[in-house]
Amino acid sequence: MEYVNLYTRQHENSLYELKNKGVIQNKRLYVGLHMKDISDFFLEKYDYFVKMASQIVAKPDEISYPIWCSVSKDNCLKPIHKEVVYAMTVPKSEVIYFDGAKWDLVLNNQYVPLDKDDEKRFEKELKSRGAGHSFNIFDRKYDEMYDDIREKIVASWDRIFEITDRSEFVVQANLWQIKE
Protein backbone atom coordinates (compact mmCIF):
# COMPACT_ATOMS: atom_id res chain seq x y z
CA MET A 1 0.00 0.00 0.00
CA GLU A 2 1.26 3.46 -0.90
CA TYR A 3 1.19 6.26 1.69
CA VAL A 4 1.34 10.05 1.39
CA ASN A 5 1.89 12.93 3.81
CA LEU A 6 -0.89 15.46 4.33
CA TYR A 7 -1.32 18.47 6.62
CA THR A 8 -4.41 20.15 7.98
CA ARG A 9 -5.23 22.87 10.48
CA GLN A 10 -8.16 22.09 12.76
CA HIS A 11 -9.75 23.52 15.89
CA GLU A 12 -8.08 22.39 19.11
CA ASN A 13 -11.29 20.56 20.13
CA SER A 14 -10.46 18.04 17.42
CA LEU A 15 -7.74 16.69 19.75
CA TYR A 16 -10.48 15.66 22.18
CA GLU A 17 -12.48 14.02 19.40
CA LEU A 18 -9.43 12.10 18.17
CA LYS A 19 -8.49 10.92 21.66
CA ASN A 20 -12.01 9.89 22.71
CA LYS A 21 -13.53 8.67 19.44
CA GLY A 22 -10.42 7.63 17.56
CA VAL A 23 -11.41 9.75 14.55
CA ILE A 24 -12.01 13.34 13.50
CA GLN A 25 -14.99 13.93 11.24
CA ASN A 26 -16.19 17.16 9.71
CA LYS A 27 -19.81 18.06 10.43
CA ARG A 28 -22.30 20.55 9.04
CA LEU A 29 -22.24 22.32 12.41
CA TYR A 30 -18.46 22.80 12.20
CA VAL A 31 -18.72 24.34 8.74
CA GLY A 32 -21.42 26.69 10.05
CA LEU A 33 -19.31 27.74 13.02
CA HIS A 34 -16.21 28.23 10.88
CA MET A 35 -17.85 30.08 7.96
CA LYS A 36 -20.39 31.99 10.07
CA ASP A 37 -22.68 34.25 8.01
CA ILE A 38 -21.53 32.85 4.65
CA SER A 39 -21.93 29.22 5.70
CA ASP A 40 -25.11 28.63 3.66
CA PHE A 41 -23.26 29.59 0.49
CA PHE A 42 -20.32 27.30 1.31
CA LEU A 43 -22.53 24.42 2.43
CA GLU A 44 -24.30 24.44 -0.93
CA LYS A 45 -20.93 24.12 -2.68
CA TYR A 46 -19.64 21.58 -0.15
CA ASP A 47 -22.73 19.44 -0.73
CA TYR A 48 -21.91 19.41 -4.42
CA PHE A 49 -18.26 18.63 -3.66
CA VAL A 50 -19.33 15.68 -1.50
CA LYS A 51 -21.47 14.34 -4.33
CA MET A 52 -18.55 14.56 -6.77
CA ALA A 53 -15.84 13.35 -4.36
CA SER A 54 -17.91 10.32 -3.36
CA GLN A 55 -17.44 9.09 -6.92
CA ILE A 56 -13.66 9.09 -6.40
CA VAL A 57 -13.33 7.73 -2.85
CA ALA A 58 -16.40 6.13 -1.30
CA LYS A 59 -17.85 8.25 1.50
CA PRO A 60 -18.65 6.42 4.73
CA ASP A 61 -22.35 6.80 5.59
CA GLU A 62 -21.72 8.57 8.90
CA ILE A 63 -19.58 11.29 7.30
CA SER A 64 -21.08 14.66 6.32
CA TYR A 65 -18.16 16.57 4.85
CA PRO A 66 -14.51 15.95 4.01
CA ILE A 67 -11.56 17.42 5.85
CA TRP A 68 -9.52 19.88 3.79
CA CYS A 69 -5.80 19.13 3.67
CA SER A 70 -2.63 20.46 2.13
CA VAL A 71 -0.17 18.26 0.27
CA SER A 72 2.70 20.39 1.57
CA LYS A 73 3.63 21.56 5.05
CA ASP A 74 4.89 24.80 3.48
CA ASN A 75 1.47 25.50 2.00
CA CYS A 76 -0.58 24.36 4.99
CA LEU A 77 -2.38 27.00 7.03
CA LYS A 78 -0.15 27.87 9.97
CA PRO A 79 -1.34 27.25 13.53
CA ILE A 80 -3.17 30.12 15.17
CA HIS A 81 -4.82 30.59 18.57
CA LYS A 82 -7.06 27.61 19.45
CA GLU A 83 -6.03 25.72 16.29
CA VAL A 84 -3.60 22.85 15.75
CA VAL A 85 -1.89 21.44 12.67
CA TYR A 86 -1.92 17.72 12.03
CA ALA A 87 0.88 16.14 10.00
CA MET A 88 -0.39 12.76 8.83
CA THR A 89 0.75 9.79 6.81
CA VAL A 90 -2.32 8.22 5.20
CA PRO A 91 -3.06 5.58 2.57
CA LYS A 92 -3.05 7.26 -0.85
CA SER A 93 -6.21 5.32 -1.70
CA GLU A 94 -8.13 7.37 0.92
CA VAL A 95 -7.11 10.76 -0.51
CA ILE A 96 -9.30 12.87 -2.78
CA TYR A 97 -6.98 15.11 -4.79
CA PHE A 98 -8.31 18.19 -6.57
CA ASP A 99 -7.20 21.43 -8.17
CA GLY A 100 -7.64 24.28 -5.68
CA ALA A 101 -7.67 26.95 -8.40
CA LYS A 102 -10.50 25.14 -10.16
CA TRP A 103 -12.33 24.79 -6.84
CA ASP A 104 -12.19 28.58 -6.54
CA LEU A 105 -14.05 28.75 -9.86
CA VAL A 106 -16.74 26.48 -8.43
CA LEU A 107 -17.04 28.66 -5.33
CA ASN A 108 -17.69 31.59 -7.65
CA ASN A 109 -20.23 29.74 -9.84
CA GLN A 110 -17.78 29.83 -12.72
CA TYR A 111 -17.23 27.51 -15.66
CA VAL A 112 -14.23 25.16 -15.29
CA PRO A 113 -12.80 25.01 -18.81
CA LEU A 114 -11.00 22.05 -20.35
CA ASP A 115 -8.30 24.38 -21.67
CA LYS A 116 -7.80 27.94 -22.97
CA ASP A 117 -9.65 27.21 -26.22
CA ASP A 118 -12.64 25.84 -24.31
CA GLU A 119 -12.59 28.91 -22.07
CA LYS A 120 -12.66 31.20 -25.14
CA ARG A 121 -15.52 29.20 -26.69
CA PHE A 122 -17.53 29.48 -23.49
CA GLU A 123 -16.92 33.22 -23.15
CA LYS A 124 -17.94 33.68 -26.80
CA GLU A 125 -21.16 31.74 -26.12
CA LEU A 126 -21.94 33.94 -23.11
CA LYS A 127 -21.37 37.08 -25.13
CA SER A 128 -23.51 35.86 -28.05
CA ARG A 129 -26.37 35.15 -25.61
CA GLY A 130 -26.06 38.57 -23.98
CA ALA A 131 -25.04 37.09 -20.65
CA GLY A 132 -21.90 39.17 -20.24
CA HIS A 133 -20.08 37.32 -17.48
CA SER A 134 -21.03 33.99 -15.96
CA PHE A 135 -21.18 35.59 -12.49
CA ASN A 136 -24.64 36.78 -13.56
CA ILE A 137 -25.95 33.40 -14.68
CA PHE A 138 -26.84 32.25 -11.15
CA ASP A 139 -28.70 35.46 -10.21
CA ARG A 140 -32.37 34.79 -9.50
CA LYS A 141 -33.42 37.45 -11.96
CA TYR A 142 -32.04 35.19 -14.71
CA ASP A 143 -33.91 32.05 -13.59
CA GLU A 144 -35.01 30.07 -16.64
CA MET A 145 -33.29 32.54 -18.96
CA TYR A 146 -29.95 30.74 -18.99
CA ASP A 147 -30.82 27.28 -17.67
CA ASP A 148 -28.76 25.55 -20.37
CA ILE A 149 -25.68 27.66 -19.62
CA ARG A 150 -26.13 27.14 -15.88
CA GLU A 151 -26.27 23.37 -16.50
CA LYS A 152 -23.12 23.56 -18.61
CA ILE A 153 -21.33 25.44 -15.82
CA VAL A 154 -22.36 22.94 -13.14
CA ALA A 155 -21.46 20.00 -15.41
CA SER A 156 -17.94 21.44 -15.75
CA TRP A 157 -17.32 21.39 -12.00
CA ASP A 158 -16.20 17.77 -11.86
CA ARG A 159 -13.09 18.93 -13.74
CA ILE A 160 -11.67 20.07 -10.42
CA PHE A 161 -10.46 16.48 -10.09
CA GLU A 162 -8.54 16.70 -13.38
CA ILE A 163 -5.21 18.01 -12.14
CA THR A 164 -2.97 19.53 -14.80
CA ASP A 165 -0.82 21.74 -12.55
CA ARG A 166 0.90 19.55 -9.97
CA SER A 167 2.24 22.50 -7.95
CA GLU A 168 1.89 22.09 -4.19
CA PHE A 169 0.21 25.49 -4.23
CA VAL A 170 -2.53 24.25 -6.57
CA VAL A 171 -3.10 20.62 -5.60
CA GLN A 172 -5.25 20.15 -2.52
CA ALA A 173 -6.45 17.01 -0.81
CA ASN A 174 -9.43 15.87 1.20
CA LEU A 175 -9.97 12.98 3.56
CA TRP A 176 -13.35 11.73 4.72
CA GLN A 177 -11.93 11.43 8.23
CA ILE A 178 -8.72 11.50 10.21
CA LYS A 179 -8.05 8.27 12.03
CA GLU A 180 -5.93 7.87 15.13
Predicted regions mapped to residue ranges:
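Conserved NAD+-utilizing ADP-ribose enzyme module
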Residues: 1-40, 63-65, 76-84, 90-180
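Short alpha-helix boundary/capping and kink motifs at helix termini
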Residues: 37-62
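Divalent-cation-assisted or electrostatically stabilized phosphate/pyrophosphate-binding catalytic cores
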Residues: 72
